[in-house]
Amino acid sequence: MKTVIALSYILCLTFGQDLPGNDNSTATLCLGHHAVPNGTIVKTITDDQIEVTNATELVQSSSTGKICNNPHRILDGRACTLIDALLGDPHCDVFQNETWDLFVERSNAFSNCYPYDIPDYASLRSLVASSGTLEFITEGFTWTGVTQNGGSSACKRGPANGFFSRLNWLTKSESAYPVLNVTMPNNDNFDKLYIWGVHHPSTNQEQTNLYVQASGRVTVSTRRSQQTIIPNIGSRPWVRGQPGRISIYWTIVKPGDVLVINSNGNLIAPRGYFKMRTGKSSIMRSDAPIDTCISECITPNGSIPNDKPFQNVNKITYGACPKYVKQNTLKLATGMRNVPEKQTRGLFGAIAGFIENGWEGMIDGWYGFRHQNSEGTGQAADLKSTQAAIDQINRKLNRVIEKTNEKFHQIEKEFSEVEGRIQDLEKYVEDTKIDLWSYNAELLVALENQHTIDLADSEMNKLFEKTRRQLRENAEDMGNGCFKIYHKCDNACIESIRNGTYDHDIYRDEALNNRFQIKGVELKSGYKDWILWISFAISCLLLCVVLLGFIMWACQRGNIRCNICI
């Protein structure tokens, strides 16, 4: 029994002694990446829910609630529509010769002159809006044998009866209304817009009282077009005390062309022309207030920032705006895959690298080093690899924004009732475009997220391989993102590994010597178990030998008798 105890004691001393390499002749260096306690969930091509350390929202879902007047010139229509300002409604005289980038029509706008209709209202409104100006030049039309400057009680200009300032209502003179034939050439180098009209009396009596003839006719032509309008006499619902109507028409005269007006009654003549300009001006219906601020993108809800590639505030936009999509949120990964640190591990109680988990303590970089040596423990970020990853992700975000921000505007579209099928088709096309863009946006973000995560992992692997190439045979890969360095490596040595100036030849002999010594006697976790089992088996064997020897000795002395029966 004393022999067994003695052998067990010897084995314990053997396996419990300090091993070579447990002293200050080695060090441990781990590589890791940033982690946060609670990451952000994003979508990738392969995974609908993957956690990353950081993500940027790509969808602008709110407006400022006000329209910024810079850098775009905003013209507030207040109580006037653009067409009323164009025609010269008395309460819209303040808009004469105005210019704009965006004309804002309000919901409380109203007409306050003779009731009218425009058969092609939407086209005229869009044409004038895109021109961006109400610059008007009066021309010397000669209307012989008729009375000019007709007025109406429905169109007061002060206390007196008035009319649209840009139109000239012609009526009979001394019971006569001769046939009018007037020409006006365009000798300038720009397009001219002429606005004219036809009066529709409510009764035959009113027709003859104003124009003598029982039925008038108006023909306006150029070399490229001709319009002939016959008045429709008949009573209509009373508007501002008038049962009659005026139909407004328009003609564009190109440079070198000529305008010809022929009529024997019912003509609402032009007083001149509007100078047409080419540009990207527009019009928008909105009740948002106009404020002094700066914004490139305007919607009916108000201005919105254009630092995001997508928005779901409004389909109608003006300026350099994010693309409209249906989604309320699309998150672009701007950080790496998040693997929260195991809190039970402790900082260096069992130091581990990026293969096991991330590090939550790194605030100055995405990638870094942790070490454990004779001088203690430490941590430092690797700024070069961090900056390389950040630069690529920032370029990616800027490319997405640049590709999707529109440098034009999505205008409002209006259709008359007879164009209902066209309106339905237009709506279908717009809805289809939005569906496609929404799908493309989600796919684009998922692809970019996948690439970002792969990129971040790649930078981590590059840093690990760079460190491995530096250390060579002086260290061993521990399989968890760490290296066991087989030579004394103080803080200066660790720093040289981090900054790429480490010279493995200096430490080569020491590392090889320590590696052989440690490998000769080092007990790794797997071998310790085997040796413990072997020592236990030897102890049991020795115990059995001693017990068997005791039995044989006792039998020889006669103290024990053994009977074998067959």
Swiss-Prot record:
Residue ranges annotated as Extracellular topological domain: 17-530
Signal sequence bounds: 1-16
A Pfam entry, by short name: Hemagglutinin
Glycosylated sites: N24, N38, N54, N97, N181, N301, N499
Official protein name in the record: Hemagglutinin
Lipoprotein recorded as keyword: yes
Gene Ontology terms describing biological process: clathrin-dependent endocytosis of virus by host cell; fusion of virus membrane with host endosome membrane; fusion of virus membrane with host plasma membrane; viral budding from plasma membrane; virion attachment to host cell
Family matches, as InterPro entries: Capsid_hemagglutn, Hemagglutn_HA1_a/b_dom_sf, Hemagglutn_influenz_A, Hemagglutn_influenz_A/B
Misc. remarks from the entry: Major glycoprotein, comprises over 80% of the envelope proteins present in virus particle.
Gene Ontology annotations for the cellular component aspect, listed alphabetically: host cell plasma membrane; membrane; viral envelope; virion membrane
Site features described as Cleavage, chain residue numbers: R345, G346
S-S bonds: C30-C482, C68-C293, C80-C92, C113-C155, C297-C321, C489-C493
Topology in membrane: Single-pass type I membrane protein
Any one GO molecular function term: host cell surface receptor binding
Residues with lipid group (S-palmitoyl cysteine): C555, C562, C565
Cytoplasmic-facing ranges: 552-566
Subcellular location: Virion membrane; Host apical cell membrane
Protein keywords: Clathrin- and caveolin-independent endocytosis of virus by host, Clathrin-mediated endocytosis of virus by host, Disulfide bond, Fusion of virus membrane with host endosomal membrane, Fusion of virus membrane with host membrane, Glycoprotein, Hemagglutinin, Host cell membrane, Host membrane, Host-virus interaction, Lipoprotein, Membrane, Palmitate, Signal, Transmembrane, Transmembrane helix, Viral attachment to host cell, Viral envelope protein, Viral penetration into host cytoplasm, Virion, Virus endocytosis by host, Virus entry into host cell
Modification comment: Palmitoylated.
Organism whose genome encodes this protein: Influenza A virus (strain A/Duck/Ukraine/1/1963 H3N8)
Family: Belongs to the influenza viruses hemagglutinin family.
Transmembrane parts of this sequence: 531-551
Subunit structure: Homotrimer of disulfide-linked HA1-HA2.
Job of this protein: Binds to sialic acid-containing receptors on the cell surface, bringing about the attachment of the virus particle to the cell. This attachment induces virion internalization of about two third of the virus particles through clathrin-dependent endocytosis and about one third through a clathrin- and caveolin-independent pathway. Plays a major role in the determination of host range restriction and virulence. Class I viral fusion protein.
